[in-house]
Every structure is written in structure tokens, then in C-alpha cells.
Amino acid sequence: SRDGYELVDIANQFYNKLLNDKDYDLADKWTIYVFPEVNQDGLANGWTNNGPGRTTLYSQAPNNKGIDMNRCWQIGDSYTRFTSNRNYNGTAGFQAYEAQALRDFMLANKSQNGQTLLVDLHGWTQQLIGNEEICSYYDRQFPENNKKSVGRYGTGYMIAWGRTYLGSTNRAAKTALIELPNQGVTGHQSVVNGNFANRYINATLDMLKNMN
């Protein structure tokens, strides 16, 4: 779960950058929601990246087993089940309370007649996944990342669900998952040395300024 703190720190740096820059043009163009910490129990009390910590600690699944929050986003009536400790996703979609809350918030706050963008930040498999246009901005900052999954949206992934359900009356939602690099990453200092936070922030701001 310590890995999660690095992602929370990057999200908080992005949030503070938005506050400090006071970019009113950007504020007029977008309503920006930042979720630094969606698996709070896993972050605080988890103990492994292949089970509790990566997954939630409690859910509506049988025996209240924790859920991989990026495998439980059901689309329509079909649901692909994952049973490993690393990717366990219950017996039906949204058995993680945290995923339910995030889903409901996004549905309530998606654009009604404009463009919704969804960027899901993860570590550390060094990939760009999802919408080609969004991924192009992160490719400029993370050229070492694998691009084989650009244009793909995974099974049970939040970005697949978002692409399906967060569109407006006029425009389809655009979604992507950014997996931070793993090369040379051994702890917090290597994340700092790799300038991951600034690279992520610069890519995100560039995307927001140039996409419509």
C-alpha cells in the first residue's frame, strides 16, 4: 500500500498547482475533480500489492473479501470474474463500496452537453492505456511507457465503464489509464528523482489546455 502514497502525493501536488496557478481560462473551460485516495482503507491498513492494500479491505462480496477496484466496473448485464487475490472482483460489479461511491459521483457530475475526460493514474507497469488523444499527451512526458494498449480499455476497468457511461448528449467521454514507470523505481526518492509528479502534471495541464 506504500505505493499508493506516491500516487496520493502526485494528486495533491496537481491539486495545489491548480490552486496556485489561478489559471482562470482553465477554470472557465473545465470543472476539474481530483480524487487522490479512492481506496482509503487499503492505503491506510493494507499490507500487500497482491491482495489487501491493492484491493479494498471490505466489500459486499462473499465473506466481505476485498475487491480490486479496477476490475469491478460492470458494463451492462455481463460481468467477467477474476478470482486471484490480486485481481479479485467479487461475484457482481460494484461490490466495493468505494467503487459505488465513485460511480455515483461521476454519474451525477458528468458534463451534460460538453466533453468529459477521465484520467486514472496508477503505478507501476509503465503503460499508456485507452484514448489515443489523451495518451498522446502523456506519451510526450513518459516516452519510456509501453503504448501497446493505447486504444484498448481493459476488462472491468474504470476507463471502460467511463467511456460507456460518462458521455454527454453531444459527445462521447474520453478516458485513459496512465501507469507510471517502474524502471529504477525502488522507493519515494526514485519517484522524486524521476520527476514523475511534474511530468504527470505537465501532461495533464497540456491536455486540459489543448483538448476541447
Residue ranges and their predicted role:
Residues L19, F142-G151, N210-N212:
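Structural alpha-beta junctions
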Residues P62, D68, Q95-A96, Y153-Y165:
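Secondary-structure junction/capping motif
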Residues S1-R140, E144:
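Active-site/substrate-binding loop(s) of hydrolase catalytic cores
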Residues K29, N146-Y157:
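A generic structural motif
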Residues L118, Q127-E132, S136-R140, G154-N212:
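Active-site-adjacent mobile loop/cap segments within catalytic or ligand-binding domains
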Residues A99, V150, A203:
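Cysteine-dependent hydrolase recognition
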